[in-house]
Structures are given as structure tokens and as C-alpha cells.
Regions:
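Outer-membrane beta-barrel transmembrane domain signature of Gram-negative proteins
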Residues: 337-341, 383-456
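N-terminal periplasmic accessory domains that precede
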Residues: 87-90, 105-108, 135-140, 149, ...
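N-terminal Sec signal peptide and the immediately downstream disordered periplasmic leader
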Residues: 1-82, 89-94, 279-283, 310, ...
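Transmembrane beta-barrel wall of Gram-negative outer-membrane proteins
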Residues: 191-222, 231-301, 340-353, 406
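Short acidic/polar hinge/loop motifs at secondary-structure boundaries
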Residues: 125-153
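Extracellular loop and loop/strand-boundary signature of outer-membrane beta-barrel proteins
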Residues: 131, 184-189, 198, 258-263, ...
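Extracytoplasmic beta-strand/coil segments of soluble accessory domains associated
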Residues: 56, 88-125, 145
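Flexible loop and strand-edge segments within Gram-negative outer membrane beta-barrel domains
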Residues: 222, 264-270, 284-349, 363-394
Length: 456
């Protein structure tokens, strides 16, 4: 749905804004206390988590039974056993998690949207800088070792974004072994209806006593399957209302609304490339660099209407329900968004397990992020003017923490976090809303009529 335009003259000069956020937290945890595990994790369909070690709830390695939070874990074995192909499908196995059938991969946790949840991938915050959303398709599901979900506010440990909880995703990384050189290949080829592909190939290799490397490539795509169904409420017919009579009664849903059709086939093409190298420095001390590249294109095509007149589907007009009621159709409701995303994520992590010290520095660079939408479409195959909203952004994050766990009955965690975020949104007029490069310069140079920026 198109936002209201704020037409203005642009000078092209770039604004800058810089500030810094620092978070310091110290937690005292009574290790000998008897903790009651939250009831909503005792669900029969949930993966077994008894005696599982978690690090997300308290930022320390702790038995999940002793954790004072509602925590659930999904492992790579759960993903393989249940043939899960997306991160959202993996999380949907857990209680309190709902996957939206409308949004592309949208999640709700205890009623909160994913924009209220902090998502970490190997320590890299994956929430975007524009609206705090998460692009789940950017995460290579077949490289995942485990997913930890902590429900409830976690601001004291992770900052203000963890209102609904924290999702911590760890990918598989082989650890160096003594005088062992080996290589492990993994992969899969999947094909399904609607031109669906799910392919993955990768390896982990021990190249020396101190160094291991790994790389994985993944592609998931589909030509589309019906999604985002459209409904409407009936209104009273007035003397001035012009209506058409459908060939058949309009389908009605249980809530009394009428099923008008759908946006059509929800297609996407997602490609991921990930790599890492780990160097063993000393005993129980290591340095790891990891990289993730992802590119995704998504769109709705071939919209469908449940209403026909004289055998032809219609997408606009007032459709007569009976002598007193009608339902209005608007072509714009049948056309979805056309989106494009491209990210680079870099992560450098130092771990000293002996002294329980961890330092992480990462960058999430969203080179491309945005979508286009049509302006006043009059046919379902409309390829005329539209709007493009493009909002790339960057997150730079530094995190360090130290744990002291031999202090009587208590454990002390001290840490510091520094984060810098920025984004720049550009809105342009397009001659063809499906073509992100078809800038309409009739009114504004390059079609650019609005710029919004933000930084923290």
C-alpha cells in the first residue's frame, strides 16, 4: 500500500548523523537456587530439551532446567528429522510461536511480531535498521547447528530490541583437533511442485592442527504458490450504486466476510553463501571469522479473482451480493510488492573458554533492501507507473563479556556493548513498477522525490 507522498525539492547533499549506544550489564545468578522451568515449554510436540546447555538466557553456559527463563531449543537433528526447509518453519515447532500465512516468513512470539524480537546469527544482529524487521530467508537453514529461543523481555542483557525475546542462531563450525586433517562434505538436492528448488552444498575442513575452514552455498526458489488471500465486507446498496451480477454466489468465510481472490503466486529466489575460518590460538582459545552473503528477489504474480462475470474474472467494480448488499473490488488489492534484498555480514569473534572471555565485532551491510508497488492499477497485469521504496542500511556492533563463576553461590557476568546503526530511504517514481531501475524523471530528477535518513 502506497504511502502519502511528501513532494519536495532535493539538493542531493548527504546528511550525516552519528551517535553511539553503549550497554553495560551485570547479572548475579543464584546457581544453587531451585528454578521452576516455565510451563509453556512442556509441550509434547516440542523438540526434547532436557539437560540441554543454553547460553542465550543468561549469556553463560547453563543447564536449561536451571535457567530462570522460558527457553526452547531446536537442533540440527530436529531440522533434519522434520525436513524443515526454512528458519520460520523450524521456530514454528516451538510453543508460543506462530507463522503468518500472509507475510513472507513473518513470525509472532506470544502475540509480538518479529520486529519486537532480537535475532542473532553467530552473534550478528540480523534485525534491519529501517523497521527492525528480520529477513528469515537470509539465514541458511541447512547450516544451522542450533536455535535458542528465549521468551520475554531481555533488555538488560541484549538491549532494547529484545522486547518479545531473543532468538540466537548458531551455524555449524568444525573445531580444530590435535594432529587431524580431514574434510567433511554435506549437501542436498530438493525439487517440488511450482518449480520449487532447495539445494545446498558445502564442506568443513581441518587444514592444520590449528586451522579449520568451511564454506556452504544454498539456493531456495519457487515459481510461486497461491498466497495472501483477499476478503471484503458487504455494504448497503444505495440508489447511486452501480453493481454487476456475478456468475456464481461470492464465497463467504466464517467471519461473514467474502473471499474475493488472492494476490496470486508468491514467488522468490534466494541465494546464500557462507564461509568461516577458525584459528586455535592456545588451549581453549580461538579466533573465528565468518562471512555471509545473501541475495533475494520476491514478488506476487498472476493474481486470482473468485468472481466472474460472463465467464471472465473481474478485479474491480461493485459486485452484487443480493438486492440489499454489494462488495467492492479494487485492482490495487490484488497486486502485491516486488522486492529485492542483498546483504553482506562479517563477524570476528575471539573466545577464551578457559577464562570465560568473549569478544565479538561484526558488521551487517545491507547493500540493497526495498520494494516497489503500483500506482492506481487498472488491470491485474498492470505494468504502469509505481513507487520504489529503497532503504539500505548498516549495523556495526562490538560486544565483550567476562564471566566469573567461582564466587560462592553466585555467577557474575559483566559486559559492554557498542552499536552504530544507519539507514537511508529513497523513494522514487517509476515508469514500470516491476522494474526497479525505470526511474521517471518527468517531475523530479531520477524520479527521486523523498529522502529519509536515520542513525544511532
Amino acid at each position: 500500500m502506497k504511502e502519502g507522498k511528501r513532494k519536495k525539492t532535493l539538493t542531493g547533499c548527504k546528511q550525516t548523523s552519528t551517535s553511539k549506544i553503549m550497554l553495560f550489564s551485570m547479572i548475579l545468578t543464584a546457581m544453587s537456587a531451585s528454578i521452576v522451568y516455565a510451563a509453556d515449554t512442556n509441550v509434547a510436540d516440542e523438540p526434547k530439551v532436557s539437560h540441554t546447555i543454553t547460553v542465550t538466557a543468561t549469556r553463560t553456559m547453563e543447564d536449561i532446567i536451571k535457567t530462570p527463563s522460558a527457553v526452547s531449543v531446536v537442533t540440527d537433528k530436529d531440522i533434519e528429522t522434520r525436513r524443515v526447509d526454512t528458519v520460520t518453519d523450524a521456530l514454528q515447532m516451538l510453543p508460543g510461536v506462530y507463522k503468518s500465512q500472509k507475510a513472507n516468513g513473518g513470525l509472532q512470539i506470544r502475540g509480538f511480531d518479529s520486529t519486537d524480537t532480537l535475532v542473532l546469527l553467530n552473534g550478528v544482529p540480523m534485525n534491519n535498521t529501517f523497521n527492525n524487521g528480520v529477513d528469515w530467508e537470509a539465514i541458511p537453514v541447512h547450516s544451522i547447528e542450533r536455535i535458542e529461543l528465549v521468551r520475554g523481555p531481555s533488555s538488560s542483557l541484549y538491549g532494547g530490541r529484545g522486547v518479545a525475546g531473543v532468538i540466537n542462531i548458531q551455524t555449524k563450525q568444525q573445531q580444530p583437533k590435535q594432529s587431524v586433517k580431514d574434510i567433511h562434505w554435506h549437501g542436498q538436492i530438493g525439487y517440488g511442485s511450482h518449480g520449487t528448488l532447495n539445494n545446498e552444498l558445502g564442506f568443513d575442513a581441518q587444514v592444520s592442527n590449528r586451522i579449520t575452514v568451511g564454506m556452504s552455498g544454498e539456493q531456495r526458489k519457487t515459481d510461486g504458490y497461491p498466497g495472501f488471500f483477499i476478503t471484503g465486507r458487504a455494504a448497503n446498496i444505495r440508489p447511486s450504486t452501480v453493481t454487476v451480477t456475478p456468475d456464481n454466489p461470492v464465497p463467504q468465510t466464517k467471519d461473514g466476510s467474502y473471499l474475493l481472490g488472492s494476490r496470486g503466486d508468491k514467488s522468490f529466489n534466494n541465494k546464500n553463501l557462507s564461509a568461516y575460518v577458525t584459528m586455535k590460538l592456545r588451549d581453549r582459545e580461538s579466533l573465528t571469522y565468518s562471512y555471509l552473503y545473501t541475495k533475494n528477489r520476491y514478488a506476487y504474480e498472476n493474481p486470482m479473482s473468485t468472481i466472474t462475470v460472463n465467464g471472465a474474472p473481474i478485479f474491480s467494480g461493485n459486485v452484487k451480493i443480493n438486492n440489499q448488499k454489494y462488495v467492492a473490488l479494487r485492482t490495487s488489492r490484488y497486486l502485491g510488492y516486488d522486492g529485492l534484498k542483498e546483504y553482506h555480514a562479517h563477524n570476528l569473534q575471539y573466545k577464551n573458554d578457559k577464562n570465560k572471555l568473549q569478544v565479538t565485532f561484526n558488521i551487517l551491510d545491507r547493500k540493497k533492501d526495498g520494494f516497489s508497488s503500483p500506482n492506481n492499477p487498472n488491470t491485474p497485469n498492470y505494468s504502469g507507473p509505481g513507487d520504489d521504496s529503497f532503504y539500505p542500511g548498516k549495523t556495526i556492533n562490538f560486544d565483550a563479556q567476562k564471566v566469573w563463576d567461582r564466587m560462592g553461590k553466585h555467577s557474575v557476568v559483566a559486559g559492554i556493548n557498542w552499536k552504530k546503526e544507519s539507514f537511508e530511504q529513497k523513494r522514487r517514481e517509476l515508469t514500470n513498477w516491476r522494474n526497479h531501475s525505470s526511474f521517471d524523471s518527468t517531475t523530479y530528477p531520477g524520479g527521486l522525490y523523498e529522502i529519509n535518513k536515520g542513525a544511532t
